[in-house]
């Protein structure tokens, strides 16, 4: 009886633990972009591609995190151009920049070129890469670190 109670207590404690942040990093596959866009129909959002190995991505993530803190209504979607095995690190890095609660994805295709082609035929994989979607889902793509005034201007024009 003692062992049964102890076992049930362990199950209760384990079941009460929060889901790990890595579990919140979804696999980005061929249909993921369409799903992301469809869920935000008529709403502006930023779609930011980055990688744990990208030298300039921390600057971008820091700026996005600061903007998110000032404007909690801004919808940011992060997609890491890494592998699902790196999900714990991806979640940890995003959280360290104040982006732990934004929607997160990670490339989950053996051929990332196929995903990049579906996302944007003109994109060759340079990172960071950010897509600004306005309310009508007009899209502006920008490679490289986006200056903070540019981000603030987009937020002012699109986030209410």
Model-found features: residue ranges?
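N-terminal secretory signal peptides that target proteins for export/translocation
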Residues: 1-4
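Structural microenvironment flanking redox-active thiols in thiol-disulfide oxidoreductases
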Residues: 59-97, 112-115
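Bacterial N-terminal signal peptides
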Residues: 6-18
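N-terminal "domain-start" segment that seeds a small globular fold
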Residues: 19-38, 101, 107
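Short active-site neighborhood of thiol/selenol oxidoreductases, capturing the structured segment around
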Residues: 39-55
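Solvent-exposed loop/turn segments at secondary-structure junctions
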Residues: 51-55, 81-85, 109-112, 137-139, ...
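Short, internal strand/loop/helix patches
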Residues: 96-127
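Thiol-/selenol-based redox modules, centered on thioredoxin-like
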Residues: 127-160
